[in-house]
């Protein structure tokens, strides 16, 4: 949980609990015939809720706890991509402290992408282009966690492919505002700061087929619900 969100949740609860789950929520879920999961972020996407429902013997929609946990962990997901021949930017996993930053600034390539392994919504993501930017990026990312993935920075169009059941749906092209990346603001704000999402993506049949096949292959490798 983000530190500021933790503080806000505690302040809103009489018992000062940091839990984002309401009182007796698991007891309520235990009464359900099936739980429809529409959760986003930590606890909802990382398999924790799914594991709790499994312990209660309550069926739910979507992927199970293991697939969710592996997909949420970028380092685990990258290893699965590598072992299944799915192309992904060159990468390495790091666990570091403030004291390691000077050494890492000498070792790591720039430009690069730095991502907290279990983050989402582009929180804890930095895209340094110079050694000076790399130093400040490594310090900033430490606010969200000390375990990160450092990737080769690649350039091109960004696509996402939804998977429903056993079918890959139409690829969607994501077009951030000019001069920006697909960051938190571009994902969730409206107006000129928002990214455009074009569906179906303006690409050919061959590219569409390749994207859909890759999405299904990755889903199956992770054990996600397909």
Question: Which ranges hold each PLM region?
Answer:
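Serine-dependent amide/ester hydrolase catalytic core
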Residues: 41, 220-221
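Active-site nucleotide/adenylate-binding loops and adjacent lid/helix of ATP-dependent enzymes
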Residues: 22-29, 68-157, 209-212
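Phosphate-binding site of ATP-dependent enzymes
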Residues: 129-213, 218
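Glycine-rich phosphate/pyrophosphate-binding beta-alpha loops
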Residues: 41, 122, 177
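Short, intrinsically disordered, charge-balanced linker/junction segments flanking boundaries
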Residues: 222-226
